[in-house]
């Protein structure tokens, strides 16, 4: 993501993972070699970035004030740069896939290619979801799937729609946050907007999981799929 950041006019990109569930986990990992990743980094751009860093040795003032008559237009003028980010990130993800053999995408799909029920979420709970999907497919013969979100902002509607099987008629979007008073949590609202106005759009419901670092189990994920089978699935 940070190589994409330097490529895309120094736009800010933040890597995120879910709190204690990931940060305090003991796990065996396979590190990527620096020499393998080095060709992905524009060394001149990296040097330029470091030279622009704020330091007491070269004090500068930036963005101190902007008048109202220009601020609105200025904020809107950055839209094309944000709109280009998904394609740039996807390009670098494809390079990482080529180097490591690990499949990375803006949205990764796992499950039956003709799934009728799909869960959309991001973070460590995707591992529990994969276990639930394997069980339901192998033991129950159910057509279920999962879409894992890897690039949340900017949110690419095109890439999301490409990741979800066309056979999906019911979708559950799970957020690891609660926004009291809102009609739904952020990811749920993004997915609803993505399907707004489309012909034969699936039924979309929302839910929450893992608040306060509570573990999300495969059994809980299976309960979500069971809810999607109901004539009127519970929403939130």
Regions found by a protein language model. Name each.
Residues 1-13:
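Single conserved hydrophobic/aromatic residue that forms the stacking wall/gate
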Residues 15-108:
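Conformationally flexible catalytic loops at phosphate/diphosphate-handling active centers
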Residues 24-31, 131-132, 159, 182-186, ...:
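Short acidic, glycine/serine/threonine-rich loops at helix termini
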Residues 91, 99, 131-146, 196-197:
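Short helix-loop-beta junction
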Residues 113-142, 155-162:
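Redox- and metal-dependent alpha/beta enzyme cores, enriched for Fe-S-associated oxidoreductases
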Residues 141-170, 174:
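Core nucleotide-handling region used for phosphoryl-transfer chemistry
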Residues 170, 175-236:
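Peripheral docking tails and interdomain loops at the edges
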């Amino acid at each position: 993501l940070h190589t994409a950041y330097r490529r895309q006019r120094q736009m800010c990109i933040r890597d995120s993972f879910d709190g204690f569930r990931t940060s305090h986990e003991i796990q065996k990992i396979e590190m990527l070699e620096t020499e393998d990743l080095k060709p992905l980094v524009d060394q001149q751009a990296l040097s330029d970035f470091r030279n622009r860093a704020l330091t007491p040795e070269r004090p500068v003032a930036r963005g101190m004030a902007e008048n109202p008559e220009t601020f609105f237009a200025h904020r809107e003028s950055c839209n094309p740069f944000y709109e280009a980010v998904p394609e740039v990130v996807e390009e670098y993800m494809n390079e990482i896939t080529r180097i490591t053999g690990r499949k990375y995408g803006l949205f990764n799909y796992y499950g039956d290619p003709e799934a009728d029920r799909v869960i959309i979420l991001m973070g460590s709970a995707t591992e529990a979801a994969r276990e639930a999907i394997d069980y339901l497919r192998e033991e129950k013969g159910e057509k279920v799937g999962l879409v894992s979100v890897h690039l949340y902002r900017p949110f690419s509607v095109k890439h999301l729609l490409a990741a979800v099987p066309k056979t999906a008629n019911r979708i559950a979007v799970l957020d690891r946050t609660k926004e009291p008073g809102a009609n739904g949590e952020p990811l749920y609202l993004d997915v609803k907007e993505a399907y707004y106005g489309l012909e034969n759009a699936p039924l979309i419901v929302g839910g929450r999981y893992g608040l306060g670092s509570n573990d999300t189990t495969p059994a809980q994920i299976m309960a979500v799929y069971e809810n999607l089978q109901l004539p009127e699935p519970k929403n939130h």
